[in-house]
UniProtKB/Swiss-Prot annotation:
Record's function text: Binds to the 23S rRNA.
Database matches in Pfam families: Ribosomal_L9_C, Ribosomal_L9_N
InterPro entries: Ribosomal_bL9, Ribosomal_bL9/RNase_H1_N, Ribosomal_bL9_bac/chp, Ribosomal_bL9_C, Ribosomal_bL9_C_sf, Ribosomal_bL9_N, Ribosomal_bL9_N_sf
Protein's UniProt name: Large ribosomal subunit protein bL9
GO molecular function: rRNA binding; structural constituent of ribosome
Membership in a protein family: Belongs to the bacterial ribosomal protein bL9 family.
Entry keywords, A to Z: Ribonucleoprotein, Ribosomal protein, RNA-binding, rRNA-binding
Domain of life: Bacteria
Gene3D superfamilies with a match to the protein in the record: Ribosomal protein L9, C-terminal domain, Ribosomal protein L9, N-terminal domain
Entries under PROSITE patterns matching the protein: RIBOSOMAL_L9 (PS00651)
Entry's Gene Ontology cellular component terms: ribonucleoprotein complex; ribosome
Organism per entry: Serratia proteamaculans (strain 568)
One GO BP: translation
Amino acid sequence: MQVILLDKVANLGSLGDQVNVKAGYARNFLVPQGKAVPATKKNVEFFEVRRAELEAKLAEILTAAEARATKINELGSVTIASKSGDEGKLFGSIGTRDIADAVTAAGVEVAKSEVRLPNGVLRTTGEHEVQFQVHSDVFAQLNVVVVAEA
């Protein structure tokens, strides 16, 4: 199925590219999320007219994402208190939602889907490095300090 991309999609292309994808991928993911439209004659003509407008909109979104990433990097670290045992192991774990809530409370709006935990959830006290993917091209980094709750 031929589609026109309205946004940058990993391993596929960027704004304006006409790509061939499987029908299910287009119908169930790309089109509902507003990342693509079917490549009909009408849509191709419509896209060519609006191309500059869409590129400006994407540039604005990218600038906003870079500003948020800078704010996250400037935070330096966020502290989260959790119940733990004697050896520093937590009762339970700290996941993406807990980290997103802590960063949002610190003053930078972050969604849980933007938090990247490559080694899984945090299960020990101490300092952990956490990545944030604010945009497909923009990443930020933050130290999360997990302390034992009194």
